[in-house]
Amino acid sequence: MQVILLEKIVKLGSLGSIVNVKPGYARNYLIPQGKAKRATERVIAEFETQRAELEKKQADILDAAGAQAAKLDGLLIQISQKAGVDGKLFGSVTSANIAEELCKQDFAIEKSMIRMPEGQIKQVGDYTVIVVLHNEVSAHITVSVLGETTN
C-alpha cells in the first residue's frame, strides 16, 4: 500500500515521502496515529498545499524537544530502593520508575521514551540512561540508585 508520510519515521522516510508499506502496518499504525495518509492523487495534491505548514509544525516540535534535551542532558536523579548488604536490589529499577522520578521534577517524560542500554537496574550504583525526546533528539541522564538496607 502506498502512503504519504506526514512526519519523519525512522527507517521509513521523511516528511512528504511516498513509500510502500504493508497494508496492516498502514491501517493499524501509520494512519490511526496520524503519521501517514493513503497516497491518492487528491491527498498528494492536498499535502503539497499544506507542506509548508507541516514542515513548520515539525520544526517547532524538534525545537521544543531540543530545548527539553538541553535541560535534561547531564541531569542526575537519585532513586532509593531496598537492597541487601551486597548491594543487590530487592526488585529492580525500571524505565517506569525513572519516568516517575522525572515527572516529579516537572519533565513530561513517558516510560516509552527511556532507553536503558544495560537493561533493568538490579544493583546499587550510577547508570547512564538515554531519554529519547524525538527521532533526532535524545539526552543522557545519570541515575544513581541508592540502597536502603533493612535490619
Swiss-Prot record:
GO biological process, any: translation
Keywords tagged on the record: Ribonucleoprotein, Ribosomal protein, RNA-binding, rRNA-binding
Record's GO cellular component terms: ribonucleoprotein complex; ribosome
GO MF, one example: structural constituent of ribosome
Alphabetical list of InterPro entries matching this protein: Ribosomal_bL9, Ribosomal_bL9/RNase_H1_N, Ribosomal_bL9_bac/chp, Ribosomal_bL9_C, Ribosomal_bL9_C_sf, Ribosomal_bL9_N, Ribosomal_bL9_N_sf
Any Pfam family: Ribosomal_L9_C
Entry similarity comment: Belongs to the bacterial ribosomal protein bL9 family.
Function: Binds to the 23S rRNA.
Annotated NCBIfam families: L9
Protein name: Large ribosomal subunit protein bL9
Organism ancestry: Bacteria, Pseudomonadati, Pseudomonadota, Betaproteobacteria, Nitrosomonadales
